Swiss-Prot record:
The chain crosses the membrane at residues 62-84. This is SLC35A4 upstream open reading frame protein. One of its GO terms (cellular component) is mitochondrial inner membrane. InterPro entries: STMP1. It is a single-pass membrane protein. It comes from Homo sapiens (Human). One of its GO terms (biological process) is positive regulation of translation in response to stress. Keywords: Membrane, Mitochondrion, Mitochondrion inner membrane, Transmembrane, Transmembrane helix. The keyword Nucleotide-binding does not apply.
């Protein structure tokens, strides 16, 4: 009888931990899926955009390592805090509009 009393809280703890693990797994899958857009373009990845921004900063400044770090951190922060537009798609649409000319 004593084993039954001890096993019930352990079972509840295991069920709680299982639910937490499933929740974490769903969150990670959602974040991974949102990292690269459905169109499959690499430039839609916020990490890559930050890395490219860091590369540009590194080319403009002498300290390449600092530029990479600042650009990558800035890209990650911006992607998490703001709705970052898809620059590649916007530029492509704009260039197509310019090629067509006025209606």
């Amino acid at each position: 009888m004593a084993d039954d009393k001890d096993s019930l809280p352990k079972l509840k703890d295991l069920a709680f931990l299982k639910n937490q693990l499933e929740s974490l797994q769903r969150r990670v899958e959602d974040e991974v899926n949102s990292g690269v857009g459905q169109d499959g373009s690499l430039l839609s990845s916020p990490f890559l955009k930050g890395f490219l921004a860091g590369y540009v900063v590194a080319k403009l400044r002498a300290s390449a390592v600092l530029g990479f770090a600042v650009g990558t951190c800035t890209g990650i922060y911006a992607a998490q805090a703001y709705a970052v537009p898809n620059v590649e798609k916007t530029l492509r649409d704009y260039l197509q509009l310019l090629r067509k000319g006025p209606d």
